[in-house]
Amino acid sequence: MARNLITDVPGVLVGNAGDAKLGSGVTVIVFESPVTASVDVRGGGPGTRETALLDPAQTVEGIDAIVLSGGSAFGLDAASGVQAWLREQGRGFQVREARVPIVPGAILFDLLSGGDKNWGRYPPYRELGYEAAKQASVDFALGSVGAGLGATTANLKGGIGSASAKTRAGITVGAIAAANAAGSMTIGNTRHFWAAPFEQNAEFGGQGWPSSLPADALAFRSKGYPGENTTLAVVATDAKLTKAQAKRVAVMAQSGLSRAIHPVHTPLDGDVVFAAGIGTTSLPDPVFALSELGTLAAHVLARAIARGVYEATALSFAGAMPSWRDRFG
């Protein structure tokens, strides 16, 4: 039975770990076996790890997990915790007798969203990464969890969202996003989401499109300063993809951000989209089937971003950003 989560793609597991006192956390996408993946970076201030090897020209073909973390650059440590867990499972790229788990990742800035960030000498993200990997399952929570725990947007609390769909040929596409954008996911000051045209089964409230656009709908609104914002996402499919095909899916999926966030891809953001092909069946047509797959990936990602905001709950700290439910019920 479909969960409307990225884990509807067989072989994908997701784990979240967070620290309420810290106001930050980690989300890990674990693949049950190595997968082909690539990445597309559009934001002006990204923070990433091991994304260079996802270029189609590079040698390593399979990755074991992808990490999305809070904590800004400190959160890059989370991938080391995930590596440690994978190593315990005997996973990783084999070089003679050695195995090295391949774990790309990306981070978002939540250092000023509230919480106690005075963690001492070493940040806690390595342990949070390990715990998130250990918790990885087909079922997982949405909203203010994992990398979405401290996430915010221009006007509302952000969070972790996910969604899935199938192509006409029955290929499954799933997405997960940590919404921490400089822009807004809602139209002006209304309850309506920019992603409303793509919504399925009232998954983010069924509010639809406003009867008329409010006067402030297209007004520029933004949160924070350069380096403080980003939307991180992973799209996955049960089709077999080459690295070049995964790259094209990641590029096309970035349109999902444009459909769900206004404004987006600004110098203030660090937007990153990973794409992974998990199946053993190649696309029936390398051009048209890939075009449909990438188009659907954008739709699914737009839905996941809106769900992340819809499912979020406000943090308990003074001055914390209100959630969608706080404002609109």
Model-identified regions with their sequence ranges:
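A structural signal for small-residue-enriched, beta-sheet-centric alpha/beta enzyme cores
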Residues: 1-73, 77-80, 87-329
